[in-house]
């Protein structure tokens, strides 16, 4: 998908619904704990190395929120998966946060952490690192308390539907900001579906609102236990073009090249992108 004059549907089958159905079926085998072990425990979850992917993602988020430009009352996290790190810097800027995921098992995993249930995944190292990066002297326990208090709901979502949250959603709409990490490319069978999914979630955002998007670069598959999930490979330029087509001004776009020691055989990801984009309009 290159060239500003190309249709969002260029290069794709006329109907992506069969591909989307296959993706949805494959995700029924998704194992949240296996995914967390693969990506948020060492080596990828080792936050001691400042050049690691975990510190890089946390820095991108913290630095963007530190500008003071991404703020408001309501934020929606699109396709949260079983993770919360993507909201650690956001929670001091938004008092009403909605987390979402297509899979009930991921929503249950989030619920365990939010309710501080025994056996919930331990995000304390991420919380500590976020506090360190932000440099405000906040203790990680307070950071986690604030995040738990400000997540008001965990809802189902389907980014392939024109109304991703369904009709009559309890989430306040439109939101002041959206965050989404490793969702759109992981659930889209082709670039046209990726573009449409981005269009769909953009309807949840107010004009002038901000989107912080994190995703995989040039990845075609990843493992989550017994599940081997397909991913639409995207490049930095394809991400930029998709954002512009969906009506955004790209404020920042950064890339991280995955080093060899973090290529652990659980996927074929080449890198990670971070995009800060603002929805055009008043």
From Swiss-Prot:
**Catalytic reactions of this protein:** phenylethanolamine + S-adenosyl-L-methionine = N-methylphenylethanolamine + S-adenosyl-L-homocysteine + H(+); (R)-noradrenaline + S-adenosyl-L-methionine = (R)-adrenaline + S-adenosyl-L-homocysteine + H(+); (R)-normetanephrine + S-adenosyl-L-methionine = (R)-metanephrine + S-adenosyl-L-homocysteine + H(+); (R)-octopamine + S-adenosyl-L-methionine = (R)-synephrine + S-adenosyl-L-homocysteine + H(+)
* Activity regulation field: Inhibited by methyl methanethiosulfonate, phenylglyoxal, tetranitromethane and diethyl pyrocarbonate. Inhibited by 4-oxo-1,4-dihydro-quinoline-3,7-dicarboxylic acid, 4-(benzo[d][1,3]dioxol-5-ylamino)-4-oxobutanoic acid and 1,4-diaminonaphthalene-2,6-disulfonic acid.
Gene Ontology molecular functions: phenylethanolamine N-methyltransferase activity
Please state what class of enzyme this protein is. Answer: transferase
Q: What is the effect of changing residue 185 to D?
A: Strongly reduced enzyme activity towards phenylethanolamine. Decreases affinity for phenylethanolamine and S-adenosyl-L-methionine 3-fold
Q: Where does S-adenosyl-L-methionine bind?
A: 35, 40, 79-80, 85, 101, 106, 158-159, 181
- Phosphoserine occurs at 7
Q: What EC identifiers does the entry list?
A: 2.1.1.28
- Annotated phenotype, changing residue 219 to A: Reduced enzyme activity towards phenylethanolamine. Decreases affinity for phenylethanolamine 6-fold. Decreases affinity for S-adenosyl-L-methionine 2-fold
- Result when mutating residue 185 to A/Q: Strongly reduced enzyme activity towards phenylethanolamine. Increases affinity for S-adenosyl-L-methionine
Protein residues bound to octopamine? 219, 267
Q: Which GO biological process annotations does it have?
A: catecholamine biosynthetic process; epinephrine biosynthetic process; methylation
Q: Name one GO cellular component term.
A: cytosol
Q: In which pathway does it act?
A: Catecholamine biosynthesis; (R)-adrenaline biosynthesis; (R)-adrenaline from (R)-noradrenaline: step 1/1
The source's superkingdom equals Eukaryota
* Spans through the membrane: none
PROSITE patterns per record: NNMT_PNMT_TEMT (PS01100), SAM_MT_NNMT_PNMT_TEMT (PS51681)
Query: InterPro entries from the xrefs?
Result: NNMT/PNMT/TEMT_CS (IPR025820), NNMT_TEMT_trans (IPR000940), SAM-dep_methyltransferase (IPR053384), SAM-dependent_MTases_sf (IPR029063)
Q: State the UniProt keywords alphabetically.
A: Catecholamine biosynthesis, Methyltransferase, Phosphoprotein, S-adenosyl-L-methionine, Transferase
Q: Family, per the entry? A: Belongs to the class I-like SAM-binding methyltransferase superfamily. NNMT/PNMT/TEMT family.
Q: State the function annotated in the UniProt record.
A: Catalyzes the transmethylation of nonepinephrine (noradrenaline) to form epinephrine (adrenaline), using S-adenosyl-L-methionine as the methyl donor. Other substrates include phenylethanolamine and octopamine. Also methylates normetanephrine.
Protein's UniProt name: Phenylethanolamine N-methyltransferase
The record's gene field reads: PNMT
